[in-house]
């Protein structure tokens, strides 16, 4: 029984979380270069309504497939946004400039940008200076707001939400994209997006790998307000 359960979890046929579509009808995957070539017109017709595409990381790295995915997604009916992976110990304004250079000055018709805040590498064992990380995140958000007139959604895990986002009043009014693969976000958390699993597969992309899947918390009218 334990082995069968493990197989179901690994193959994505059973998840710890399974938010019902009637409760969260707006949903979609996180898109990165590891998916390989994506046939966007077909990919977007698989009962998804949105997607966030990784654009940049730090001050120098651009996702290798970002431009193809950004352009390819224009010809679909789903709402798409771009996100940046924050380097916690690197100047936030410089990171925002890198993101802006990649995605362009005008995001009309796109979802508001997002910024991923996650502990990576040695930081999983030896936590970073959380105050420095919060300063860099705040500087990133401020520069994005100055450029596009909107604050980015903050994509965080339990650890980064607790230690960086929720503990700093500068982020009190920012929209939260919360990743929790084993349980639903706490009832007292005001979240906008929730990544609930990393074991979803679709068709029409080259790698066939498992993807992170996200739902939106709100009505269709609420969702439309996130489009620039």
Each PLM stretch: what is its role?
Residues 1-11:
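Hydrophobic membrane-insertion alpha-helices, especially the h-region
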Residues 13, 21-41, 53-139, 145-147:
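Substrate-binding cleft of extracellular glycoside hydrolase catalytic domains
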Residues 23-36, 171-228:
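Functionally critical loop-and-helix segments that line ligand-binding/catalytic clefts
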Residues 42-48:
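A short, Lys/Arg-enriched amphipathic alpha-helix followed by its capping loop at the start of a domain
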Residues 49, 79, 151:
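Residue-level detector of anion-binding/catalytic polar loops
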Residues 51-53, 81, 175-179:
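Short hydrophobic/aromatic-enriched beta-strand-loop microsegments
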Residues 111-187:
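Catalytic domains of cell-wall/extracellular-matrix polysaccharide-remodeling enzymes
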